[in-house]
Design a protein with these regions (language model features):
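Mid-to-C-terminal catalytic subdomains of enzymes
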Residues: 120, 147-201, 205-215
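Conserved beta-strand segments that form the floor/walls of ligand-binding pockets within enzyme
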Residues: 23, 175, 221
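Short, aliphatic-rich beta-strand segments
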Residues: 46, 213-224
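ATP-dependent adenylation/nucleotidyltransferase module used to activate substrates
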Residues: 1-162, 203, 218
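Acidic-residue sensor for enzyme active/binding pockets
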Residues: 59, 198, 221
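A broad detector of the eukaryotic-type serine/threonine protein kinase catalytic domain
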Residues: 19, 95, 181, 223-225
Length: 225
């Protein structure tokens, strides 16, 4: 299918949902999804965002302004991943536990608004990577409209640009927990240290980089833009 056919299918699928809550991170995928859902369903859409220390502040700058401009009802919840014993020990499937807890909170907010359908921004590209968090989506019956319409990251960028979304060329961020090797304890102090280091690099003008922690050694990865 070409991108316009996928776009038409996406809107048709969304129309059938009726009333929905969008898991909104402020990134490329969820911003595009939220925009299309709102265009199709209007006030039958709410956005629910989760703020954690594992998401650098710079990654969601602009998201609250976007939602306000669109006139979408927006809920923001604070969640401390460190409270999950199965997460802070950093096992290979940590994303599953974290994702499930986050989704349960979103489901609770949606239920209070009389909404039973939750959607997220997963797309075709997500099927190519190791994504233990997808198990949580399946278990909790979360819908992925972009995936159902066969949309790739490239499709989403093209359509986001056409819609004039500020996120159309935004890079996909990686959770701060990914900066640690499996089995390395994730603590608030270590996350704060990495956030500070990455902000210094961002202030220098770099956009594609990671600071990874290996015991007491920090490794900086930078990609030429």
């Amino acid at each position: 299918m070409d991108v316009e056919t996928k776009y038409a299918l996406l809107k048709e699928n969304i129309k059938n949902y009726g009333k929905i809550a969008v898991a909104y991170s402020g990134g490329l995928d969820s911003t595009f999804l939220l925009k299309v859902c709102h265009d199709v369903l209007g006030d039958n859409v709410i956005a629910v965002s989760i703020r954690t220390d594992l998401q650098p502040v710079r990654e969601y700058l602009g998201s609250e302004e976007f939602v306000k401009k669109e006139g979408i009802k927006h809920f923001i919840l604070k969640f401390n991943d460190y409270t999950l014993p199965c997460f802070k020990n950093n096992p290979p499937d940590r994303c599953y536990y974290c994702k499930k807890e986050i989704l349960l909170r979103i489901i609770n907010v949606a239920a209070n608004e009389g909404i039973t359908t939750i959607v997220d921004g997963s797309n075709m590209d997500d099927l190519c990577d190791y994504r233990p968090g997808r198990r949580a989506l399946t278990e909790l019956h979360i819908k992925s409209p972009l995936l159902e319409a066969g949309m790739t990251k490239k499709d989403i960028r093209v359509l986001s640009q056409k819609l004039g979304l500020y996120t159309w060329n935004k890079l996909s961020p990686a959770c701060m927990a990914s900066r640690f090797p499996y089995g390395t304890a994730i603590t608030p102090e270590r996350i704060a240290m990495l956030n500070k280091a990455e902000q210094v690099i961002a202030d220098l003008g770099f956009t594609q980089f990671r600071v990874r922690l290996h015991d007491e050694v920090a490794r900086i990865e930078v990609i030429n833009d």
